Curated annotation (Swiss-Prot):
GO terms for cellular component: cytosolic small ribosomal subunit. This is Small ribosomal subunit protein uS15. It comes from Alkaliphilus oremlandii (strain OhILAs) (Clostridium oremlandii (strain OhILAs)). GO terms for biological process: translation. It comes from the Bacteria. Part of the 30S ribosomal subunit. Forms a bridge to the 50S subunit in the 70S ribosome, contacting the 23S rRNA.
Length: 87
């Protein structure tokens, strides 16, 4: 992921000025990496090592989404809507 792209994602989803680790930021960064890896796997179908990494990232994102849903349902709904995940 390009550093400038990462910075724009952090700026978009941060909850306060120095925020880099909130669940929203982590979910947004993981979503970007997942989308990038999906494009890679479309052209490299036999790259099973990357596919395993993709599955780990999807699992981590799912855990963060579940955490956010348990803690603050409004923030969960907001991040789902912004990223276009689920429904």
């Amino acid at each position: 992921m390009i550093q400038e792209n990462k910075k724009t994602i952090i700026d978009t989803f941060k909850t306060h000025e120095n925020d880099t680790g909130s669940p929203e930021v982590q979910i947004a960064l993981l979503t970007e990496r997942i989308n990038h890896l999906n494009e890679h796997l479309k052209s490299h179908k036999k790259d099973f090592h990357s596919r395993r990494g993709l599955l780990k990232m999807v699992g981590k994102r799912r855990n963060l989404l579940n955490y956010l849903k348990d803690r603050d349902i409004e923030r969960y709904r907001e991040i789902i809507a912004k990223l276009g995940l689920r429904k």
